[in-house]
Amino acid sequence: MRILVNGEGADVRGAQNVAELIDGYRMPPQAVLVEHNGVALHRREWRERALAEGDRIEIIHVVAGG
């Protein structure tokens, strides 16, 4: 299945939902913000949010600093 991740085409055959997509990128979930088709998601929604052909995902990796 092809989707857009941060504006670039991505083949995500193994990911059925947002949680599996994030797992595939090996990002710590507590440090990631996700938007799915223009809707910001809470982490508890990731497993419930199925991916479909053509979806748009924005992933923001939050880094602490000062």
PLM features: what roles do these ranges have?
Residues 1-65:
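Ubiquitin-like/PB1-type beta-grasp interaction modules and other compact soluble beta-rich domains
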